[in-house]
Swiss-Prot record:
Record organism: Monkeypox virus
Annotated transmembrane regions: 112-132
Similarity field: Belongs to the orthopoxvirus OPG104 family.
SS bond list: none
Taxonomic lineage: Viruses, Varidnaviria, Bamfordvirae, Nucleocytoviricota, Pokkesviricetes
This protein's record includes keyword Membrane: yes
Keyword Aminoacyl-tRNA synthetase part of the UniProt annotation: no
Self-association and partners: Part of a stable entry-fusion complex (EFC) which is at least composed of proteins OPG143, OPG147, OPG155, OPG086, OPG094, OPG107, OPG104, and OPG099. Formation of the viral membrane is necessary for the assembly of the complex.
Major location category of this protein: virion
Location relative to the cell: Virion membrane
Record protein name field: Protein OPG104
Purpose: Envelope protein part of the entry-fusion complex responsible for the virus membrane fusion with host cell membrane during virus entry. Also plays a role in cell-cell fusion (syncytium formation).
Signal peptide start and end residues: none
Keywords (A to Z) from UniProt: Fusion of virus membrane with host membrane, Membrane, Signal-anchor, Transmembrane, Transmembrane helix, Viral envelope protein, Viral penetration into host cytoplasm, Virion, Virus entry into host cell
Encoding gene per record: OPG104
InterPro entries assigned: Pox_virus_G9/A16
Length: 133
């Protein structure tokens, strides 16, 4: 298909999965802006073999220098302190390591002086400075 045919089809079928790379959701574009990584480098519909991509978008995708990794957590058991992480990122290494687990310190420490006295204290300090200088 030519670029004109792709745009004509996708203009009338914006919800088609093959057109999602041309017309992504606003949330996808926002994630791309926040991560400073263009959405077309990692967005799944852009990687589909049947995706409708104009020549300019194909050229931009070819410049993406991204290693797309899928990392999933397997058996997470706190009682045995065992964490099984499966990394599918062009490597065959699967490591299972024992990790020492301890509870977080959840002790609440209150400030020495209540915060509501801060503006009054600053006002008193300003008056003292003005009175003596």
């Amino acid at each position: 298909m030519t670029d004109e045919q792709i745009y004509a089809f996708c203009d009338t079928n914006k919800d088609d999965i093959r057109c999602k790379c041309i017309y992504p959701d606003k949330s996808i574009v926002r994630i791309g802006i926040d991560t400073r990584l263009p959405y077309y480098c990692w967005y799944e519909p852009c990687k589909r073999s049947d995706a409708l991509l104009p020549a300019s978008l194909k050229k931009n995708i070819s410049r993406c220098n991204v290693s797309d990794c899928t990392i999933s957590l397997g058996n997470v058991s706190i009682t045995d302190s065992k964490l099984d992480v499966n990394n599918v990122c062009d490597s065959k290494r699967v490591a299972t390591e024992n990790i020492a687990v301890r509870y977080l310190n959840q002790e609440i420490r209150y400030p020495i002086i209540d915060i509501k006295w801060l503006p009054i204290g600053l006002l008193a300090l300003a008056i003292l400075i003005l009175a003596f200088f």
